[in-house]
Amino acid sequence: MENTENSVDSKSIKNLEPKIIHGSESMDSGISLDNSYKMDYPEMGLCIIINNKNFHKSTGMTSRSGTDVDAANLRETFRNLKYEVRNKNDLTREEIVELMRDVSKEDHSKRSSFVCVLLSHGEEGIIFGTNGPVDLKKITNFFRGDRCRELTGKPKLFIIQACRGTELDCGIETD
């Protein structure tokens, strides 16, 4: 065998000490050493799209125009990515929590990932059901590794399209 800079033979590695790489305690067990996820399960995953457009009068919130177009585009995009897509419209805060609890208890063993898209009004750290606010932590906590074991080590994406308060966001300029 030619001895080049990029080649290794068994003699050169016999006396090497094994190198142990410790992950952080918060790291899901399915992440490989190169920080990538295993995405070869039989199904790509489940995508839940919650589209809140119309709000109860008691909230004082206006209807969200354009949100149906966003929801349709997201549905098409995730279907093209081979996700099972479920659209839910105008859910109360209680219905959002119940839906997330139920979805977290589903059989995800054959799925590579999970996506939740929330289209609604919001503020910093919260999203609005049609009748009031829900803490985002309450929603995402259902999918923690200790509560939703079948998604441990798999990507869980939460996409939130909502205002985060009343302060002006100057945005960023791109090329």
Feature map (PLM): residue ranges:
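Structural motif
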Residues: I48, V115-L119, L157-I159
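Short coil/turn segments at secondary-structure boundaries
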Residues: T59-S65, D90, M100-R101, F128-G132, ...
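Eukaryotic basic, amphipathic alpha-helical target segments in cytosolic regions
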Residues: L81-V85, S104-R111, E124, R147-L151, ...
